[in-house]
Amino acid sequence: MSTVICMKQREEEFLLTIRPFANRMQKSPCYIPIVSSATLWDRSTPSAKHIPCYERTSVPCSRFINHMKNFSESPKFRSLHFLNFPVFPERTQNSMACKRLLHTCQYIVPRCSVSTVSFDEESYEEFRSSPAPSSETDEAPLIFTARGETEERARGAPKQAWNSSFLEQLVKKPNWAHSVNPVHLEAQGIHISRHTRPKGQPLSSPKKNSGSAARPSTAIGLCRRSQTPGALQSTGPSNTELEPEERMAVPAGAQAHPDDIQSRLLGASGNPVGKGAVAMAPEMLPKHPHTPRDRRPQADTSLHGNLAGAPLPLLAGASTHFPSKRLIKVCSSAPPRPTRRFHTVCSQALSRPVVNAHLH
């Protein structure tokens, strides 16, 4: 009787401890109540004289075993197989089944192109290899380990940007901005002075450089010269360089001999002025205007002596023979040096074409 009383007390204590767990299992949807308030083991009442109380062994109840078997075969329990624990020894899974279960249950993480672990290692190695800033407190040199050197050798030196073939070709090409190529520079608008000035020679006056001979030959100037081969170059000063007194004296000279000046302007320029094209005759060659008051006897004798043995200059568009006696007489005589007024008149352009009717 004493053993039965002890068993009842133990059963009551066990039920008191199991009740909160049973309530939790009933509230959760994933669990099914496994046991009821019935006893979990068979209460065999052997004689006390054969088996003492402390030697009594508890055996699971047959109903509990059947219930657990049915529950393990249910689909709800199969959905809990990812926990990978055996319920009963007879239903244990073999090693291959466990491996398959682990392989199927693992999450598949997409692998990126650049591993973060390798990137962290490379950044750490670069940080170690970079020279530390020198300070008063930390002046110790950076110590490289053998492992870091071997890893750097295995990884290889990084390719730099200037090693590319495209940049090497750009470096090997000559610099066109510094090369002396007149055609290329003239196309870009850079003019080169072909008349190099010596170091000791001073700069000439602007009046002397105003002529076209002292100007650098550009592409535009060459085209204009090729179009007008018979044009004469005027070496006189421009209109902006004339003095006020000379500008006032120009109209007076023009009014004195208007026809002669106009005919000489046509012969000196080499091209007819205006829209109409007039053919140049040998008789229309220019004459140097001179008046009795402007003649200089000293200049006449010197020029006559210098030009006596010199051949007569020929224009590009003029013929080689001279049919007119008047032209031969004019060319044989030594004309005086043209005055400054003649240059100022030649530098001015006529407003309208003039017909030289008096020469025909």
Curated annotation (Swiss-Prot):
Signal peptide: none annotated. It holds the Pfam family DUF4607. InterPro entries: DUF4607. Disulfide bonds: none annotated. Residues 193-245 are annotated as: Disordered. Coiled coil: none annotated. It comes from the Eukaryota. Residues 202-212, 225-241 have a biased composition (Polar residues). This is Uncharacterized protein C12orf42. The gene is C12orf42.
